[in-house]
Amino acid sequence: MNTLNYGITGNCRTAALISETGNIEWLCFPDFDSPSIFASLLDREKGGSFGFEVSDDYRITQSYVPHTNILSTQFSSREGEFVVLDYMPCYRSKDGTGHYLPAELYRYIHWLKGKPR
């Protein structure tokens, strides 16, 4: 059985579950009651995911950017280092009375040093 050690990012409209190795393994899109786009959490062969393949010598850590829904997954090895930021935006309306929740998932990959493989 898989561990259930997942990070989550969402915007009150939907959410993505991101494994401790940085793979998006569950995402219903654009809403919680929509069909899944990624579902390898339930079926590794048919479910699909969006992630990275790195060598076994990488150290992978996850944390949230303080006071945000932005999940940071950092990949470090002797070869190089990079960080992946995952988030779903949630905007306040211009008049401040509500929120705009676009159906968007952002995955920002930031190179830090070396030549990651």
Predicted region positions:
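Beta-sandwich/jelly-roll carbohydrate-recognition scaffolds of carbohydrate-active enzymes
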Residues: 2-20, 24-117
